[in-house]
Swiss-Prot record:
Family recorded in the similarity comment: Belongs to the iron/ascorbate-dependent oxidoreductase family.
Required co-factors: Fe cation
Gene name linked to the record: ACO1
Annotated protein name in UniProt: 1-aminocyclopropane-1-carboxylate oxidase 1
Keywords recorded for this protein, A-Z: Ethylene biosynthesis, Fruit ripening, Iron, Metal-binding, Oxidoreductase, Vitamin C
Keyword Metal-binding attached: yes
Amino acid sequence: MAPTSTFPVINMELLAGEERPAAMEQLDDACENWGFFEILNHGISTELMDEVEKMTKDHYKRVREQRFLEFASKTLKEGCDDVNKAEKLDWESTFFVRHLPESNIADIPDLDDDYRRLMKRFAAELETLAERLLDLLCENLGLEKGYLTKAFRGPAGAPTFGTKVSSYPPCPRPDLVEGLRAHTDAGGIILLFQDDRVGGLQLLKDGEWVDVPPMRHSIVVNLGDQLEVITNGRYKSVIHRVVAQTDGNRMSIASFYNPGSDAVISPAPALVKEEEAVVAYPKFVFEDYMKLYVRHKFEAKEPRFEAFKSMETETSNRIAIA
């Protein structure tokens, strides 16, 4: 296991003072070489975060725990009987809330009204933070302010934004199942509010698994496949996983600020060098990418990119012949 001491942690307060150039350089390095970083003093109140954590854990205990225990008992039995089946399971209890383009939080069963209102407040704060971070990335990339948020909005004028709320309960057989299998994220920029007492999130760097350190009131940020494409590979999405733990119930609230379903994604022209003879990344509609991703989430991302490059080539050839 590689040490966590070098994992990038960025104090966003420094962006407002004399240390801004150094903080921006640290952010750029994290995006280029890690694809993950942790931010402190990000503008979301600690009181709101504490309330979200309390109500999320209470909701799991009250509504989801018994269901998961029943699922877990069946899962472990089947996994012991069929190891191949166990390798395709994740030891997590989740529900998903969509915020944009239209919220579905009123339709999620078993959420009390206070929790719904709280999650809407939290989502609004995260949306603002995501767009702020995207503008900081634009600054480092030499793109005009708002380029990334505009690219994400697409013709319909709205990104896709949603939150996956997960619990990773204690697992008696972490040798048998993962908390969440290794993958890259399909979308844009991901903001994670994770448990500060129970770890398990790891990223793959230089062939080694690196722990993402739990830190109180921090937000973990990682970059998805779409930012890799738009930045023409300058920034990369990174393989990560959640390791099942024998002790503790890990909370994870991951909010995905993604392109709208109709957004056309391609490398930013300003980041494509004229001398590049071979196109590194394809052009595609985000919804089409997601259709491919859901079938191949736990596989390497490169074949997904290549599949769309092949489609582009075939289309160009048909046009040329016509």
